[in-house]
């Protein structure tokens, strides 16, 4: 178990002022907006300070340390009871941004840069909120703890409550000379370019969470949430795991068959068109469809669109009659439903 005094770098008999000075120094050094790799250490320092700066909590901690912990004692439960009230107000607010993603990126993944306006740590006061050359003073109302404690009588007994200090808004400091750049807020609005890593299989309506990329706060920054919308593709349509496209072919190629190359989302692809292909026949190519978030991959379904000749000269007419001297007579066909109707709605 880590020693809370050791986390702050103070002796076990350190005064409240010594503990407060140690915390302020470490907080400025380890703040996630200044040193992103030290987020865990910053959290530990904040936890240690919140316990040791409060006489009752410090006495309780010292008593457990000196007396030893029982086998079923959970230090995280002790921490949780101390920090549920005070940690949240120190965290920055979350941000939400909407992005449009092309179909290829949505299927195979990629990255996209978006510009957002968010609160960042002030580059003049480095988040101290005071004008350079001045220091913050301890808040008189909460004695620097950031919370005001009270006692409520209930039928179950007296309950100790903790509320964010309204005077310092939970910062524990009194700012007599506020920074002129950020007006004493410790942060300011600024544009930022954020690279969004898009996983394969994203669909419209999905939300991506990027931790600690939201607004700056007194401690941890908020999170950035990205709502995705997949743009329509001019040639390809996604339906579940499968991709659909329509391929125009001539009557000759439909009758005799051929081999063509198409530009799919996955690169150039050779497609064999069988002889005697009918209009709206579907050629299914396995594992060339859409990728899902779970890692599966669908098929590429190519719907054939046979193009009839728009004009026939006498020579062509005579040749067709010679090839097909007795064609079948026109007759009513039974109505079909299901897959054929679905394709018709998609591609007509």
UniProtKB/Swiss-Prot annotation:
InterPro entries: DnaJ, DnaJ_C, DnaJ_domain, DnaJ_domain_CS, HSP40/DnaJ_pept-bd, HSP_DnaJ_Cys-rich_dom, HSP_DnaJ_Cys-rich_dom_sf, J_dom_sf
Start and stop residues of the CXXCXGXG motif repeats: 122-129, 139-146, 165-172, 179-186
UniProt binding sites for Zn(2+) 1: 122, 125, 179, 182
CDD domains noted in UniProt: DnaJ, DnaJ_C, DnaJ_zf
SMART domains linked to this entry: DnaJ (SM00271)
Biological process, per Gene Ontology: chaperone cofactor-dependent protein refolding; DNA replication; protein refolding; response to heat
Annotated keywords: Chaperone, Cytoplasm, DNA replication, Metal-binding, Repeat, Stress response, Zinc, Zinc-finger
Domain of life: Bacteria
One function term, GO molecular function aspect: unfolded protein binding
Cofactor(s) listed: Zn(2+)
Protein name according to UniProt: Chaperone protein DnaJ
């Amino acid at each position: 178990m880590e020693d809370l005094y050791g986390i702050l770098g103070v002796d076990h008999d350190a005064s409240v002022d010594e503990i407060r000075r140690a915390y302020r120094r470490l907080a400025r050094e380890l703040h996630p907006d200044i040193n992103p790799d030290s987020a865990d250490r910053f959290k530990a320092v904040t936890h240690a300070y919140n316990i040791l700066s409060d006489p009752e909590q410090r006495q309780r901690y010292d008593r457990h340390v000196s007396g030893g912990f029982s086998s079923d004692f959970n230090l995280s439960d002790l921490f949780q009871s101390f920090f549920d009230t005070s940690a949240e107000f120190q965290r920055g607010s979350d941000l939400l941004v909407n992005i449009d993603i092309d179909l290829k990126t949505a299927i195979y993944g990629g990255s996209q840069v978006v510009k957002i306006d968010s609160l960042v740590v002030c580059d003049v006061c480095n988040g101290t909120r005071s004008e350079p050359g001045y220091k913050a003073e301890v808040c008189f109302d909460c004695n620097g703890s950031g919370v005001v404690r009270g006692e409520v009588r209930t039928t179950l007994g007296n309950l100790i409550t903790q509320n964010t200090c309204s005077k310092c808004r939970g910062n524990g400091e009194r700012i007599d000379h506020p920074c002129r750049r950020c007006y004493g807020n410790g942060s300011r609005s600024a544009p930022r370019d954020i690279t969004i890593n898009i996983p394969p299989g994203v669909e419209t309506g999905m939300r991506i969470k990027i931790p600690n990329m939201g607004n700056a706060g007194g401690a941890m920054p908020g999170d950035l949430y990205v709502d995705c919308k997949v743009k329509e593709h001019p040639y390809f349509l996604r339906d579940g795991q499968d991709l659909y496209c329509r391929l125009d072919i001539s009557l000759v190629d439909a009758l005799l068959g051929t081999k063509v190359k198409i530009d799919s989302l996955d690169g150039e692809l050779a497609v064999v068109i069988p002889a005697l292909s009918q209009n709206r026949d579907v050629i299914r190519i396995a594992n060339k469809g859409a990728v899902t978030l779970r890692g599966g991959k669908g098929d590429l379904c190519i719907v054939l669109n046979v193009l009839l000749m728009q004009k026939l000269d006498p020579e062509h007419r005579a040749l067709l009659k010679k090839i097909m001297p007795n064609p079948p007579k026109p007759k009513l066909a039974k109505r079909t439903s299901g897959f054929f109707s679905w394709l018709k709605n998609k591609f007509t």
